[in-house]
Amino acid sequence: RSAGHIQTYYNHKSMHYYHPYRVTSSKPLWHFGHGLSYTEFEYSEPVLDCTKLKQNGTLTVTFNVKNVGSRDGEEIVQMYIRDEKAQVARPVKELKGFKRVFVKAGESVAVQMTVTPEMLSFHGLDMKPVVEPGDFTLMVGPSSEDSILKTIKFTYND
């Protein structure tokens, strides 16, 4: 098996039993954002400044990244968003932001990222950009691997 061995589909319903192939795993060999470091990082649970995003508003997510290793290091923090229900099939998660942070060994850094309504838009059935009201899941972590992402939910109302 290699990194280019099999296609990965991102636009499907978010079901735990999704498996488009019968003979092999549909999981990627390396998740997007996977990388090696000389140290290790831990993420705290994310906190939102509000849980309802309005049409012209913003939402800020704050979380801590702690360097639990013995060396100083840089981490690329990634933020993903999932639309829980839309009129068209949406990606299970979409990268909506990233930030490089430097953390000294044993220390913790507070990270803030902003969500805007434009980040929730997609091309609807009429092929025009649309932002639908509804529930969304925000995920933060070092890569797109589900098991290490920290999640929190919010709603959008226009």
Regions found by a protein language model. Give the residues of each.
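Intrinsically disordered, low-complexity Pro/Gly/Ser/Thr-rich segments with frequent PxxP/GP/PP motifs
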Residues: 87-123, 127
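Secreted, periplasmic, or luminal enzymes acting at the cell surface/secretory milieu
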Residues: 1-74, 80, 105, 133, ...
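Generic beta-strand hydrophobic packing signal
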Residues: 44-46, 98, 152
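Terminal connector regions
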Residues: 116-158
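Intrinsic-disorder/low-complexity, polar/charged segments enriched in Ser/Thr/Lys/Arg/Asp/Glu/Gln
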Residues: 58-60, 108-112, 149-151
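Glycine/Thr-rich phosphate-binding loops that ligate phosphate moieties of nucleotide
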Residues: 27, 98, 144
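Short acidic, flexible loop segments centered on an aromatic residue
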Residues: 70-87, 93-95
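Short coil/turn motifs at secondary-structure junctions
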Residues: 68-70, 84-86, 118, 143-145
